[in-house]
């Protein structure tokens, strides 16, 4: 950090450009921190300062492209959103929408089990078609972890772009849940009446998602709807890993 502090802006830009011409990230430092309310440790992967600069550059390019395509009720690691907004949405669904049943989902070991190939395809699917950039992201995902070797899956917590990548992975799940009811649009919808009819007389599941990182809730009006969502999620979430 002290070395970078002595660099001029031009020197930093030239260095980062030189790194990107044939990018090879340095090994990530493994740090274990305590999990709140648990005896277990949370593994973090801390990149070197120059790799953090590269990740910040990538974040500033990707975030404006991805943000409009993320679901409106995903609140974790996003600009101008917080846990307070997620809580407000939950309160609104309970008090105004009468959604009293909750499917509470926390994906165990999510960050450590992200499928690299699927993630890169999802980035492509969001309209990011710069193969050179995708290649650099692939190299970041494969950064060696000191004392552990090269990972075959997962995105290390501690990286600057890891939160954005996690939202990209879970964006498909957000929209799948939402399309079951909240954003469902029947093909022949000609009026609001038809839209309401289609909701009532189909096998759609009545539920609304509220997600913060890998922890999300689906609010439902009945126990039966919550049970249907729960069983469907067990099946649909497997390809995410």
Where are these regions (language model features)?
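Acidic, glycine-rich two-metal-ion catalytic cores of nucleic acid-processing enzymes
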Residues: 18, 24, 28, 41, ...
């Amino acid at each position: 950090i002290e070395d970078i502090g002595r660099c001029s802006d031009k020197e930093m830009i030239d260095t980062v450009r030189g790194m990107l011409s044939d990018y090879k990230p340095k090994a990530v430092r493994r740090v274990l921190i305590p999990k709140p309310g648990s005896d277990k440790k949370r593994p973090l992967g801390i990149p070197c300062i120059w790799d953090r600069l590269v990740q910040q550059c990538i974040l500033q390019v990707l975030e404006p492209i991805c943000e409009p395509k993320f679901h409106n009720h995903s609140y974790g690691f996003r600009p101008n959103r917080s846990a307070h907004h997620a809580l407000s949405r939950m309160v609104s669904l309970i008090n105004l929408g009468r959604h009293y049943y909750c499917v509470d989902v926390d994906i165990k070991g999510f960050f450590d089990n992200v499928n690299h190939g699927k993630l890169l395809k999802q980035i492509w699917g969001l309209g990011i078609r710069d193969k050179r950039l995708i290649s650099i992201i692939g190299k970041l995902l494969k950064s060696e972890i000191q004392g552990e070797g090269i990972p075959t899956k997962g995105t290390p917590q501690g990286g600057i772009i890891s939160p954005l990548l996690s939202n990209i992975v879970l964006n498909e799940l957000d929209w799948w849940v939402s399309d079951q009811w909240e954003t469902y649009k029947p093909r022949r919808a000609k009026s609001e009446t038809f839209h309401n009819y289609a909701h009532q007389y189909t096998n759609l599941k009545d539920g609304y998602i509220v997600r913060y990182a890998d922890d999300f809730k689906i609010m439902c009006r009945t126990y039966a709807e919550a049970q249907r969502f729960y069983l469907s999620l067990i099946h649909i979430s497997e390809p995410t890993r």
